[in-house]
């Protein structure tokens, strides 16, 4: 039976490249001269530290533009609260979402079932597998999910016949 998997993955090498480009741009920009702004990346998080909210927002804008240029969806970013740090600084932690959560998996599952197409979908850890007898039905599901805004970036992989 034909099937495909729905996943939500982010290329961490591209994230690393985008963060490094952002660091370089901050070092060169005139409005950041003499400011104490820094970005650090650890596994699935990016920590932003700056002197005030204005500069923090500017760093986020730069980071988002670099993500977009590198082909990473900004839907994969989950922004934490802006916190006060020591020395009058402000901090924000951005988490990079990998995989599809159980709640999002159920939501996608319901969207697929509402179509009344002859396909089955199963939640498998952080991905969904969709199977059906007809390839056209599977392609219709892909088009439907591409058109919906589910809050996560979806990739369709492992298409088998």
From Swiss-Prot:
Pfam families: DUF520. It comes from the Bacteria. Transmembrane segments: none annotated. The keyword Nucleotide-binding applies. One of its GO terms (cellular component) is cytosol. Keywords: Nucleotide-binding. GO terms for molecular function: nucleotide binding. SUPFAM superfamilies: YajQ-like. The keyword Hydrolase does not apply. InterPro entries: DUF520, UPF0234-like_C, UPF0234_N, YajQ-like_sf. Nucleotide-binding protein. Belongs to the YajQ family. NCBIfam families: PRK05412.1 (NF003819). This is Nucleotide-binding protein Gura_0717. It comes from Geotalea uraniireducens (strain Rf4) (Geobacter uraniireducens).
């Amino acid at each position: 039976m034909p099937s495909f998997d729905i996943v939500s993955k982010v290329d961490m090498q591209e994230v690393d490249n985008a963060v490094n480009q952002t660091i370089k741009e901050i070092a060169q920009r005139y409005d950041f001269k003499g400011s104490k702004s820094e970005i650090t990346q650890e596994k699935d998080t990016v920590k932003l530290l700056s002197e005030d909210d204005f500069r923090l927002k500017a760093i986020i804008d730069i980071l988002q533009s670099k993500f977009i240029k590198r082909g990473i969806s900004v839907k994969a970013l989950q922004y934490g609260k802006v916190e006060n740090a020591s020395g009058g600084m402000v901090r924000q932690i951005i988490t990079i979402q990998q995989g599809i959560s159980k709640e999002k998996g159920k939501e996608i599952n319901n969207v697929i079932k509402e179509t009344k197409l002859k396909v089955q979908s199963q939640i498998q850890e952080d991905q969904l597998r969709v199977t059906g007898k007809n390839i056209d039905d599977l392609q219709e599901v892909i088009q439907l999910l591409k058109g919906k805004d589910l809050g996560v970036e979806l990739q369709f992989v492992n298409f088998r016949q």
